[in-house]
UniProtKB/Swiss-Prot annotation:
It is found in: Cell outer membrane; Secreted. Pfam families: HCBP_related, HemolysinCabind. Its main location: membrane. This is Iron-regulated protein FrpC. The lineage of its organism: Bacteria, Pseudomonadati, Pseudomonadota, Betaproteobacteria, Neisseriales. PROSITE patterns: HEMOLYSIN_CALCIUM. Keywords: Calcium, Cell outer membrane, Membrane, Repeat, Secreted, Toxin, Virulence. PANTHER family: S-LAYER PROTEIN. It is a peripheral membrane protein.
Length: 1829
């Protein structure tokens, strides 16, 4: 590579490809330019955005754009330039890649650009002509003139150099050289310097460059100077003259006619106003305010600034002219001087004009105290409020289209026109009021029309001689009346009447020739002026040829050339003449005559005329009905009142149409009439369809709809100028569609008229409350009176105030009336609280509500605010285009202004708002405005990232301006000014200063690009540097400090700080506290200071500095770069002998011997200290330096303590010595001696020897063939990979061989060792080797689970080989061979046989997968089956036998055994003893044998077998599977009659009648015997079988003893019979009879009947409505839930009703009963005395009880009756009366009155049958009622 040559790396090329993929050519070229590519520097300027460029770069870009425009045209440039640029850039990157990183040469660049240009559709010749394909490399080479496009064809070689045979490029370069010499040898240098200064001045002026400015200066003749002008001066000084000239033009235009310019500018901007100006008044006032402010700015600042700059520019131009000129460039000098003088004069003139206009404006506005006065001042400046017509134009479009289609005809205007400029007859479209209006059809109304362009003319004849072309009669076309009284078919037919000699030519020979004129409508207004009417002679026209052809050529813009002929000029040439069909727009119309109005009439509300209707005010002057209606409408005070009158107003205006009265019958017709100016709008097929459907009839519904629409059709005809006398339809659907379009259009019309009259009528009184102020030359509006006016109305009519304010805001666009929107929000909130909001919204209508709730603006100047009409309190507002005002209001809002000069308004309680203000346009001015008295001192200004945060100090709100500080506040997101309610304004510079001020809190401070000093002060601060050299002081607090691109100094100060360097050579000082320092790029210095710090140098040569008391610090020094030199430097007298150096993992630990600190250098020893984390040198304060090699030696030295020693890759011997040490091998063959202590030794990748020595050691092999010797102690050895030898030594050791063929060595006294030998590899051979004379007969071999136990018979040791028998000894855990010291070897098969031999002790024997017979013999043995069919005999002892997966036979033998089947169909025989049998899965057979056994079948169809003497056995048969069949089989002659079948709970009990045994089937009766526990069948030895149903019947049979009988769910009758029985009901309605005996009867869930019968019985109801009858005896009855009936019967009974409405029944001889009637529900309980009258019963209080006594033998005690209502009986029923709770409640509450009044019942008289005396009866009478039947 040559010196200075740029060569890119693959990574840099990949970065360039990223720019290409994103389409960012500017960024890509800038990236290349920064790498040193000169060509890229110029290319970036060519493709960059104007906003990215300035001075010379912008000049070059404009020059290149000129070249494109000159060569292929501006349109092609705009379409293809960016695509060509992107492809060229991509190809340029490909060339770099192809050249292995070298930059392309000039020829490669030219070919690349040529390919890019032609690829995108530019012709090859044009691509060659585009000097741009050579200009880019020329710029790179320094040939600036070629780069700006001196095209070859414009340079005469002989005038430059005498080299006609030279190449084009050489000649051009020589020309430049000659020019350079010709201009004093310094032309290029001076030119560059001068041009840059000029461009800077123009930039200061804020002007933009134009392309053709210099073309206004005339040519200089021929020769090199002319070429120089065209190619150089034009290109380089492009636009200077035009800039100056345009400014003059704009200034004059803005200030001409003084205040009248205000009106013109507003109209030019598209503002439309009415005579009264009360319509859209806000547009007027806002425009006036803006223009006035512009005037003031131009006079006080703008003009002075501009003149000063242009004067300086003029002087520079003069000086430059002198410097640049000598004899050959005199012309250039003169041009420059002329330009300078012109600029000076232009700006002096502009200044003078502006000052005069400003003064006039001041005087004008000072005299305007109110809006009303302003309106009067401007009344005569505006002819009509025409805007409403354009606003409503679209609403009429469907109607016009439909009527044209349905009346079958379209109308056009038909004049004759001449091509005057030779480029064909050109026309323009209709443009409403801004275009041509002409009275074609002679009705006195000028309507909008397509028109002939200004460079062509209409053939006309002034018939009445008034010098004006009045109407279509004076054109030649379909409105020309012929001699016979008819109208001409077209223009040629009209002209033919003037051919007096019949030669088919109109010339001087024809009498009328001299009367013909050509109207060239120069101003395109449709009104002929004298200078626009020219004779044929003046235009050199000799004759007009009447011959023509029908061409029907579409001219665009809705116009058609119908016929075309020609005319002849006096020079003999011909030109085109044609008959046009011009588009007609009847909507935009103006009456030609004017109605004079009285002063009173002139005050009426007004709308511009439309269609065939005059202006509303004029029409009212001619119609009394309309005038009265307009007056009434204007006087209506509410929206409802105006809407009620609106239809009538619309009709009365329509009735002033001269055509009114012609109804619009909708009828079917096939008779078509076509005149010269009408065409048929239907196709032939449609006409045929019409004829086919000629008899289409309409339904009554359709006819009714048509009748209702007739009147509206007439109205719309008047407003649109249409004629819908006959409308055609082809179906009922067509007819109904006409009705729909009619109604929709009418509704739109009504809405439009309503809205446009709003501010002239109902809302006008409010507007009159607005006043004007002039303060300090500032024009403002005062709305205070307007707020008062609305609040005054609200006091008496809240709905009117609400609706009026809403419509003023929706349609008035009061941009600066912020109070109005807040007032609306208040009204909304009040309406919502009052429940009126929905009603008010209905009055307003959907459109108005939508406008007030809208969140997105348009291209116009919009006002957006959430005033409560939206669904959400938090809204997002989008201004889009235009100068918008966005007011978030309450809530947390998102405001995005879009393009234009936008204003964001915030008042009190503005919430948590966000402003997104992206707008890259120049000249825009975006503002945040605080109102409601908010001033700057009430807010704080802070920065977060690039966002500006403006917070209210009282926490009432915050505004976040996103990306405000992009480009240091000069970017596209900035807010240009922040305005406060006291008039104070903050510009960007002031805001930037504010956000750098610190507080005592947690601040975020940001430096700018120029470099700053930031002080965090108190608090936990964030400080951010930028591109300059910054000083960032965190001061107190836990600070975060971020460097920028400069060489920054970061001081953390006090606290736990985080310091981050960046690209420069930074100095980071953490100060006090535990700090984090990160230098990142650059050669940084990091000083942690006091505290425990983390230091990260990043890339570059970094220095870490540690002084006294440096703390517990960590250094992370990752840097893979070559050539860097990182240093740790100890200061404050610290020397190496004051420190210790140790290693932990890859970390280096440098500790102070006095314990005052430690530095941990992370990963220092990666790659043995040669990796990316190393510290290259450690420096001490005495000058001593340690390099990496020295440090490596230091850290391998052991001590008497616990050391960590590491080998290096070359192989080492490490001795741990005393202490619990950690030794680590590396890649070499290491010898690692732990020596004394509990050591941990780790092998590396070599073949290492690890010796634990004394102590409990852990030895870990690694990849090599290692030798591990644990030595004394309980050691852990892990060989890992490789063929390792493991010697546990003395102690209880754990040996793990790992992968490879490993050998485990055991000698005398080997202890209790464990071998874990997992290795799934094939081909490995693992061995246990016994030494020291140990032979096989000295050991025993047993199995426990899958483990192999090898025990010394003398108990001196045991080796457990874990999982040896996995997969029957063929698994990954096996030991392949066991070697003994006598040479004997045991393989796996031999070992497997040894461990199946039983002893007289307790053995564990395991079957193998192939099937085995195991005999336990004596002892309590464990036998385990496997996958085969095994025979497992427990023999004597209490054995545990486990089946495997096969069909196994398990025999317990003697003893209490446990037998467990598994997956197969197993046979389990318990034998003698109390055994537990579990069949688990499969169809098993279970035989308990003698003893009391527990049998559990598990899943499958199981059989339980019982023979003689089977004992007390239990069957647990849970199995929920369907299809299973479980059986109990009795053998040995046992039959059913030898057994009893009873039920206990859900269990089935099968008992031998001789008492020899019992089988309990647990839960048999779950779900009435259909559950998962059932036995499906019981088989007997005589062949009899009992199914479940039979068993269920057997267990319900009673005996003479004490039975337990259970009902089933379906409902049963159970009879207990003799004995003390237990009867249980179920869910059905059961009858439960206890019969004789003391029975216990329990109801179920049904409505049960319980009869105790004889004896002392206990009856318990449950959930249903039960009947409980105790019968004879002393019974206990409890009804529990339900409405129960309790009958105690004979005896002394205890009755407890429970919950529900219960009835207690007592008959004669019921005995001494007790009722406990406690309840918490509201049910009613009754006590019924059958056979008793009320007088027979005594009521006696006994404590808290009530006793009802019929005799000494018969009485009832109601327990706790007087405790309260919960204990009472509600009603007492007797044979002759009933006493209810309401009757006696009042006596109870009165104390003892009840008992006193009833005490007679307790008298002896009553008891002996005496009568009740009269007094007692009188008290008792109210309590007695006749019982209900």
């Amino acid at each position: 590579m040559n010196e200075g040559e740029v060569v890119l790396t693959p990574e840099q090329i990949q970065t360039l490809r990223g720019y290409a993929s994103r389409g960012d050519t500017y960024g890509g070229w800038r990236y290349l330019a920064n790498l040193g590519d000169r060509y890229a520097d110029n290319a970036a300027a060519i493709v960059g955005k104007d906003t990215n460029l300035n001075g010379l770069n912008l000049w070059m870009k404009k020059g290149v754009e000129n070249l494109w425009d000159d060569t292929v045209g501006k349109k092609t440039r705009l379409e293809k330039f960016d695509r060509v640029a992107l492809q060229h850039f991509s190809q340029y990157v490909d060339l770099i890649n192809k050249n292995n990183g070298r930059l392309p040469n000039t020829s490669e660049i030219e070919r690349s650009y040529y390919k890019a240009v032609t690829y995108h559709g530019v012709s090859s010749s044009a691509a060659i002509d585009l000097v741009i394909n050579r200009s880019l490399p020329d710029m790179a080479d320094g040939y600036w003139a070629l780069g700006l496009g001196i095209e070859a064809e414009r340079i005469h070689n002989e005038q430059a150099v005498n080299n006609p045979n030279g190449s084009e490029r050489d000649n051009r370069k020589q020309l430049i050289s000659a020019l350079d010499k010709g201009f004093d040898g310094s032309f290029k240098e001076k030119h560059f310097t001068f041009l840059q200064s000029v461009m800077m001045d123009l930039t200061k002026l804020g002007v933009e460059y134009t392309i053709d400015g210099w073309q206004k200066i005339g040519g200089w003749g021929n020769g090199i100077i002319n070429d120089l002008y065209k190619s150089v001066v034009k290109r380089e000084w492009t636009g200077i003259f035009e800039i100056v000239n345009n400014n003059i033009k704009q200034g004059n235009e803005a200030f001409k006619n003084e205040i009248n310019s205000l009106v013109h500018d507003m109209k030019a901007a598209g503002k439309e106003f009415g005579d009264d100006l009360n319509t859209q008044w806000n547009n007027l006032t806002q425009a006036a305010e803006i223009i006035y402010n512009d005037i003031v700015d131009n006079t006080s600042q703008g003009i002075e600034k501009g003149v000063k700059a242009i004067k300086e520019l003029s002087e520079k131009m003069k000086n430059a002219a002198s410097d640049l000129a000598d004899g050959s460039a005199e012309k250039a000098k003169q041009v420059v001087e002329d330009l300078a003088q012109a600029a000076k004069e232009a700006y002096e003139n502009a200044k003078s004009t502006a000052e005069k206009a400003a003064q006039a404006a001041r005087e004008f506005f000072k005299g305007l105290p109110s809006f009303k006065d302003l309106a009067e001042k401007f009344r005569d400046l505006f002819p009509n409020p025409e805007g409403w017509i354009d606003d409503g134009h679209q609403c009429f479009a469907p109607w016009v289209k439909e009527t044209k289609k349905r009346n079958g005809k379209y109308h056009v205007y038909d004049p004759l026109a001449l091509d005057l400029d030779g480029d064909g007859i050109e026309t323009v479209a209709t443009k409403g009021f801004s275009g041509s209006l002409f009275d074609h059809n002679r009705d006195g109304i000028r309507t909008a029309t397509g028109w002939v362009a200004a460079d062509d003319g209409l053939l006309v004849r002034d018939l009445n001689g008034n010098g004006i072309i009045d109407n279509g009669a004076e054109l030649f076309g379909d409105n020309t009346k012929l001699a016979d009284g008819s109208f001409a078919k077209h223009g040629y037919a009209a002209l033919a009447e003037l051919d007096s000699n019949g030669d088919n030519i109109i010339n001087a020979a024809d009498a009328a020739f001299q009367t013909l004129r050509v109207w060239q409508d120069l101003n395109q207004d449709g009104i002929s002026q004298a200078n626009e009417l020219r004779t044929l002679e003046e235009l050199g026209i000799q004759s007009l040829d009447l011959a023509y052809k029908d061409v029907n050529k579409n001219l665009g813009n809705g116009n058609t050339l119908a016929q075309q002929g020609s005319y002849t000029k006096t020079d003999g040439t011909t030109a085109k003449m044609g008959d046009l069909l011009l588009a007609a727009d009847n909507l935009h119309s103006r009456f030609k005559d004017k109605v004079e109005l009285t002063a009173e009439q002139a005050k009426a509300a007004n709308l511009a005329g439309i269609g065939r209707l005059r202006d509303l005010r004029e029409a009212a002057a001619l119609s009394g009905d309309l005038a009265n209606m307009l007056k009434a409408y204007s006087a209506a005070e509410t929206k409802e009142a105006q809407l009620a009158l609106l239809d009538n107003l619309i009709h009365k205006w329509a009735e002033t149409d001269s055509n009114w009265g012609k109804k619009s019958p909708m009828r079917l017709s096939t008779d078509w009439t076509q005149t010269a100016n009408e065409g048929i709008a239907l196709t032939p097929s449609q006409v045929a369809q019409l004829k086919k459907n000629a008899l289409v009839s309409l339904s009554d519904k359709a006819k009714a709809a048509i009748d209702a629409a007739r009147d509206r059709i007439a109205v719309l005809d008047a407003y649109t100028g249409q004629d819908s006398s006959t409308l055609y339809y082809m179906s009922e659907e067509d007819a109904l569609n006409i009705v729909k379009v009619t109604n929709d259009t009418y509704d739109h019309l009504a809405k439009n008229i309503y809205q446009n009259l709003l501010f002239q009528t109902r809302l006008q009184p409010y507007l009159n409350q607005i006043s004007f102020k002039m303060e300090n030359d500032t024009f403002t509006l005062d709305f205070s009176g307007l707020v008062q006016a609305f609040n005054h109305v609200k006091e008496t009519n809240p709905q009117k105030a609400f609706v009026d304010l809403a419509e003023m805001l929706a349609y008035g666009e009061l941009r600066s009336w912020y109070e109005g929107r807040r007032l609306m929000a208040d009204y909304v909130e009040e309406a919502k609280k009052a429940g009126k909001f929905e009603d008010y919204q209905k009055v307003l209508g959907q459109e108005t509500v939508a406008l007030l709730a809208k969140t997105s603006g348009t291209q116009a100047d919009d006002i957006l605010q959430n005033v409560g009409f939206g669904h959400n309190k938090n809204v997002s507002l989008y201004g889009n285009d235009g100068n918008d005002t966005l007011i978030g209001g309450a809530g947390n809002d998102y405001l995005e202004g879009g393009s234009g000069s936008d204003t964001y308004v915030f008042g009190k309680g503005f919430g948590q708002d966000t402003v997104y203000n992206y707008d890259y346009a120049t000249g825009r001015k975006d503002i945040i405005r605080f109102t409601d008295g908010i001033t700057a001192d009430m807010l704080t200004f802070t920065r977060e990232g690039n966002h500006l945060l403006i917070k209210a100090k009282d926490d009432s709100g915050q505004v976040t301006v996103q990306s405000y500080f992009q480009n240091d506040g000069s970017g596209a997101y900035r807010i240009d000014e922040i305005h406060f309610d006291n008039g104070k304004v903050l510009d960007v510079a002031t805001v930037k200063e504010l956000v750098q001020q610190s507080t005592d809190g947690s601040d975020r401070l940001y430096a700018y690009q120029s470099g700053n000093t930031l002080n965090g002060g108190l608090g936990d601060d964030y400080l951010y540097g930028a591109d300059g050299d910054d000083l960032l002081n965190g001061d107190a607090g836990n600070d975060s400090i971020y460097s920028g691109n400069g060489n920054d100094t970061l001081n953390g100060g006090e606290g736990n700080d985080a310091l981050y360097g960046y690209n420069g050579n930074d100095a980071l000082n953490g100060g006090e506290g535990n700090d984090h320092l990160n230098g990142e790029d650059g050669n940084d210095t990091l000083i942690g200071g006091a505290g425990n710090d983390y230091l990260e140098g990043g890339s570059g040569s970094d220095t870490y500095v540690f002084g006294k008391g440096f703390g517990q610090d960590t250094v992370y020094n990752y840097d893979y770069a070559t050539g860097r030199k990182d240093i740790i430097r100890f200061t404050d007298g610290i020397t190496a002998d004051m420190l210790t150096f140790t290693r932990e993992g890859n970390h280096l630990l440098i500790k102070a011997k006095d314990g005052s600190g430690q530095v941990t250098v992370q990963s220092y020893f990666q790659n043995d200290g040669s990796g990316a984390y190393r510290i290259d040198e450690i420096h001490f304060d005495n000058g001593k330096v340690l390099d990496v090699a020295t440090v490596k030696e230091l850290v391998q030295q052991s001590t008497d303590g616990s050391d960590r020693l590491y080998a290096y890759q070359s192989g080492n011997t490490l001795n741990g010595g005393l202490g619990d040490d950690y030794l680590y091998g590396a890649d070499g063959d290491d010898l690692l001696n732990g020596d004394a202590g509990n050591d941990s030794i780790y092998s590396g990748n070599g073949n290492d020897t690890l010796d634990g020595g004394e102590g409990n050691d852990a030895l870990y092999g690694y990849n090599g063939n290692d030798a591990l010797n644990g030595g004394e102690g309980n050691d852990h050895l892990n060989g890992e990979d490789g063929n390792d030898t493991l010697i546990g030594g003395a102690g209880n050791d754990y040996l793990e061989g790992g992968s490879g063929s490993d050998t485990y060595v055991f000698g005398k006294g080997f202890g209790q060792d464990t071998v874990y030998n997992y290795d799934y590899a094939t081909g490995r051979k693992d061995i246990i080797r016994f030494t020291d004379g140990i032979t096989a007969d000295m050991l025993t071999f047993t199995r426990e689970g899958n483990h192999l136990l090898i025990k010394a018979k003398d108990d001196s040791g045991q080796v457990t080989v874990q999982s040896y028998f996995q997969n029957d000894g063929s698994g990954a855990y096996r030991i392949d061979e066991i070697h003994f010291d006598n040479g004997k070897v045991l393989d796996v098969a031999t070992v497997k046989e040894l461990v199946q031999q039983s002893t007289d002790g307790s053995d564990r024997l395991y079957a193998y997968q192939s099937g085995s017979t195991l005999n336990g013999g004596l002892g309590d043995d464990y036998l385990y089956g496997a996958d085969g069919d095994d025979l497992l005999n427990g023999d004597a002892g209490n054995d545990s036998i486990y089946s495997g997966n096969g069909n196994d036979t398990l025999d317990g033998g003697e003893g209490n055994d446990a037998l467990y089947g598994y997956n197969g169909n197993d046979a389990l025989n318990g034998g003698e003893g109390n055994d537990h049998l579990n069949g688990e899965d499969g169809n098993d057979t279970l035989i308990g044998g003698a003893g009391n056994d527990y049998l559990e079948g598990g899943s499958g169809s199981d059989t339980y077998v019982f023979g003689k003497g089977f004992g007390q056995d239990t069957v647990y048969n849970y199995d929920y599977a369907t299809g299973r069949k479980d059986i109990i089989r009795f053998t040995d002659g046992i039959t059913a009659d030898m057994l009893t079948f009873t039920r206990e709970g859900n269990h089935l009990l099968i008992k031998a009648k001789d008492g020899s045994g019992q089988v309990t089937v647990q839960s048999y009766f779950q779900n009435d015997g259909s559950g998962a526990y059932r036995i499906d069948e019981i088989h007997f030895d005589n062949g009899k079988v009992l199914d479940v149903a039979t068993v269920k019947k057997l267990v319900q049979q009673s005996t003479d003893g004490s039975d337990r009988l259970y009902a089933y769910q379906s409902g049963n009758t159970l009879n207990g019979g003799l004995g003390d029985d237990y009867l249980y009901g179920a869910d059905g309605d059961d009858l439960l009879n206890g019969d004789a005996g003391n029975d216990s009867i329990y109801s179920g869930n049904g409505n049960d009947t319980l009869n105790g019968g004889e004896g002392n019985d206990a009856l318990y109801g449950y959930n249903g409505n039960d009947v409980l009858n105790g019968g004879e005896g002393n019974d206990h009855l409890n009804g529990e839930d339900g409405n129960d009936t309790l009958i105690g019967g004979a005896g002394n009974d205890y009755l407890e009703g429970g919950s529900g409405s219960d009835t207690y029944v007592f008959g004669k001889g019921f005995g001494q009963d007790t009722v406990y009637n406690y309840h918490v529900d509201k049910n009613s309980d009754t006590m019924h005395f059958k056979g008793f009258k009320a007088a027979d019963v005594h009521f006696i209080r006994s404590g808290s009880d009530l006793v009802l006594s019929a005799s000494e033998q018969d009485n009832v005690r109601i327990s706790g009756f007087f405790y309260g209502e919960n204990h009472r009986v509600d009603t007492f029923v007797f044979d002759d009366a009933a006493i209810s709770n309401p009757d006696f409640a009042k006596y109870i509450n009165a104390g003892n009155n009840l008992v006193q009044s009833m005490s007679v019942f307790g008298s002896n008289t009553a008891a002996t049958g005496g009568n009740v005396d009269a007094n007692t009866q009188s008290v008792q009478q109210p309590l007695l009622v006749t019982p209900s039947a």
